[in-house]
């Protein structure tokens, strides 16, 4: 079976008319806690989900369509294999029936699915996540950026809100989505607004750097709140928001939130939310380090872990062609101009170039330098106001500006369509940030190009970079190999190289002593 296409507007097929007709009243009559496995022709209950004390179980309704149930198991297995999908489920048989077509979505008595018309088929992370999330299971998704994670958690979120009765929705919000940056929060809001407006579900977006009064008004009638940790904590502290009614919690970009030091903030926020017995928790992350595993263990109950690809090491999207040029620092400006002139094509919408710098001052200098050479360019970095940053992003997305100079503030989560080239003027501080930077291109099944200007100052990261290139089947230049392919062991800030990371989620082995 060929690999399923990703969501793109280039390979559009209209939704089947059968899906559009799904507006039957009371069509969600199904048994809670259902996951579909091998040889399943009907629903089966998930162990642990029908606990009488688990109030969320009675709210979770999912039954696969007859068409999905009728698919041969060999077809399902081939889909999982061809898309490198791995499932780890502590409660049940890990096999399942992914929703590989929009026509396999569970019936709905409203217009929730209509905005899907512009897409051809679910992405792999959506196909596998939806049946689990619809069934009320806690879920951890590990997938590359640009894989369609927003709808993977967003569609079940809205469907869950619609399933709740009036008494359960009276305490708002019913669903909370936490994300590390305001740009990503706004992006999630924009994507979900198309679906929520079709079914009259109120959503709000709260983040720092914007007036609080307006956001306070927005969240009063919002069933779904999308928030950054800092502003959410502020609103909790002044009792603007009450999270005691949250039944659906999403932690998006969990690894990035840990990188930015938000772990304690998240711990504090979750204290005001119902326990795992009464809520469903979804986590998405691009990487799966020990810290994220420990966070997942403390916030979820018997979660299913879905991994797209190999999460053991950080890996770059193989659809992105990576080129590394080793040069002297003083050669960067002239080489930058050569590359821009080669790949810039009249500012067309499909020729956007994203230029990354490490520091704010450098980004401002590079932006001025590029602008002085006649290019239309905008910038985004930490010294800019919220309004200025959004203005730059919107200009870049719309195509009125085809060059954007950014620091790593824009490197994660932002879905900017049709970025032709990512150009790293300076190498980031970590190999993870490198992978996240270049992930701005090659999104949603498209091909991409990333060019990195590498100097001797960056040689400490030559080993990890070489590993990423090789893992993605990319050419490794000899000039890079001369710096060495050794990967240095990460050091703890207090204990140095003697520190050993431990996976605290593992159960200790039982030792039996003879009498």
From Swiss-Prot:
Gene3D superfamilies xref list: P-loop containing nucleotide triphosphate hydrolases (3.40.50.300)
- Do you know which Pfam families this protein is assigned to? DEAD, Helicase_C
This protein's superkingdom? Eukaryota
The Helicase ATP-binding domain, residue ranges: 130-306
Give start-end ranges for motif DEAD box.
252-255
Single GO cellular component term? nucleolus
Which molecular-function annotations from GO does this UniProt entry contain?
Answer: ATP binding; ATP hydrolysis activity; RNA binding; RNA helicase activity
Sorted alphabetically, which InterPro entries does this protein's record hold?
DEAD/DEAH_box_helicase_dom, Helicase_ATP-bd, Helicase_C-like, P-loop_NTPase, RNA-helicase_DEAD-box_CS
Subcellular localization, as worded in the UniProt entry: Nucleus, Nucleolus
Domain Helicase C-terminal, residue spans: 335-484
Which Gene Ontology terms describe the biological processes this protein takes part in? Answer: rRNA processing
Q: What does this protein do?
A: ATP-dependent RNA helicase required for 60S ribosomal subunit synthesis. Involved in efficient pre-rRNA processing, predominantly at site A3, which is necessary for the normal formation of 25S and 5.8S rRNAs.
> What does the sequence similarity comment in the record state about its family?
Belongs to the DEAD box helicase family. DDX5/DBP2 subfamily.
Let me see what the UniProt entry remarks about domains.
The Q motif is unique to and characteristic of the DEAD box family of RNA helicases and controls ATP binding and hydrolysis.
Q: What is this protein called?
A: ATP-dependent RNA helicase DBP3
